[in-house]
Curated annotation (Swiss-Prot):
Mg(2+) binds at E12. Catalyzes the formation of S-adenosylmethionine from methionine and ATP. The reaction comprises two steps that are both catalyzed by the same enzyme: formation of S-adenosylmethionine (AdoMet) and triphosphate, and subsequent hydrolysis of the triphosphate. This is S-adenosylmethionine synthase. InterPro entries: ADOMET_SYNTHASE_CS, S-AdoMet_synt_C, S-AdoMet_synt_central, S-AdoMet_synt_N, S-AdoMet_synthetase, S-AdoMet_synthetase_sfam. The keyword Oxidoreductase does not apply. GO terms for biological process: one-carbon metabolic process; S-adenosylmethionine biosynthetic process. It comes from the Eukaryota. L-methionine binds at E59, Q102, D249, K280.
Length: 396
């Protein structure tokens, strides 16, 4: 048999103790607190952090009574930042708050100061968003991204359950997968390289780190079929990684948008998700575009699909909707586009209702802020629900 043409593709992830991800989680914890008391809250909450300091700032209009400082400290503590030697002390760090109300110009243009019916609500800003899906995993997500993300989540799990007590909160993962292009569909052949850089305490040796990571992190996450004697492992390749979290690097909300989405596959319009209420189409538009792309692939209409939607501020109807199935569609893309338009309402007010996006609290949005917004399980991830699509198979 002739050798199959293959290529390498890499995706990375960071876990919840990474400074940028810490900021995403604080911003979404603030959003949860606002929506829990006032589902109509307008939230644009940014967070930044550096040694011994966390600042939340932005525009928030809400009837909720929000204790910003408590949310910051609780979120940092929940991640594991409980002393300066791990990178931040949740109970003693400086917390700065600079929150103002949403601009009345934006409020009028988008919501008509709450006088508009849901279908009349305009987009909160201009922009274009993408949704992507592929049949290469049960989650309809790229394998390189799924594995990198799950390695990061597993690192946190074995830290918190004390399987690997030497672990500290900060860490990064990266997975290179060897793929075959099957007429536009992506078929994973094997895992080429696994990279893990994790923060650790002073007591552990590099050999112990490598052995524990292989046994307790890599083995449970990466299916055996993808690993072989040629798979390369880089486990803390720089040597020591004791100083981490905000003490090691500054952090900022919205800096990990590829990790939040598809690991470099598909496309990205550039807008971050965390700290934004659902009238911000950066978030809600990307969520409905994912649901549309996933439903196309799950319905068997195509093996791989990308959907783009675009908006103008204050205008409810999207300016454009685009579908590309990379040549994997069972019917022409223009027919698939019509199916998408018939089955999905891209007006912001209707996305909010159909995906129940005003329901915050109980960590709903906080959950999205680490380990990806897509390919996740649970009732809170409403955009992952596949909509059954009717289509006519072309006669042979």
């Amino acid at each position: 048999m002739a050798a199959v043409d293959t290529f390498l593709f890499t995706s990375e992830s960071v876990n919840e103790g990474h400074p940028d991800k810490l900021c995403d989680q604080i911003s979404d914890a603030v959003l949860d607190a606002c929506l829990a008391e006032d589902p109509d809250s307008k939230v644009a909450c940014e967070t930044c952090t550096k040694t011994n300091m966390v600042m939340v700032f932005g525009e928030i209009t809400t009837k909720a009574n929000v204790d910003y400082e408590k949310i910051v400290r609780d979120t940092c503590r929940g991640i594991g930042f409980v002393s300066n030697d791990v990178g931040l002390d949740a109970d003693h760090c400086k917390v700065l708050v600079n929150i103002e109300q949403q601009s009345p110009d934006i409020a009028q243009g988008v919501h008509g100061h709450f006088t508009k019916r849901p279908e009349e609500i305009g987009a909160g800003d201009q922009g274009h968003m993408f949704g992507y899906a592929t049949d290469e995993t049960p989650e309809f997500m790229p394998l390189s991204h799924v594995l990198a993300t799950k390695l990061g989540a597993r690192l946190t799990e074995v830290r918190k359950n004390a399987t690997c007590p030497w672990l500290r909160p900060d860490g990064k993962t990266q997975v290179t997968v060897e793929y075959h292009n099957d007429n536009g569909a992506m078929v994973p052949i094997r895992v080429h390289t696994v990279l893990i850089s994790t923060q650790h305490d002073e007591t552990v040796t590099n050999d112990e780190i490598a052995a524990d990571l292989k046994e307790h992190v890599i083995k449970p996450v990466i299916p055996e079929q993808y690993l072989d004697e040629n798979t390369i492992f880089h486990l803390n390749p720089s040597g020591r990684f004791v100083i981490g979290g905000p003490h090691g690097d500054a952090g900022l909300t919205g800096r990990k948008i590829i990790i939040d989405t598809y690991g470099g596959w598909g496309a990205h319009g550039g807008g971050a998700f965390s700290g934004k209420d659902p009238t911000k189409v950066d978030r809600s538009g990307a969520y409905v575009a994912r649901q549309a792309a996933k439903s196309i692939v799950a319905s068997g209409i195509a093996r791989r699909c990308i959907v783009q939607v675009s908006y103008a501020i204050g205008v409810p109807e999207p300016l454009s909707v685009f579908v590309d199935t990379y040549g994997t569609g069972k019917i022409p893309d223009k027919e698939i586009l019509e199916i998408v338009k018939e089955n999905f309402d891209f007006r912001p007010g209707m996305i909010i209702i159909n995906l129940d996006l005003k329901r915050g609290g109980k960590g709903r949005y906080l959950k999205t802020a680490a380990y990806g917004h897509f390919g996740r399980e649970g009732a809170d991830f409403t955009w992952e629900v596949v909509k059954p699509l009717k289509w006519e198979k072309p006669s042979a």
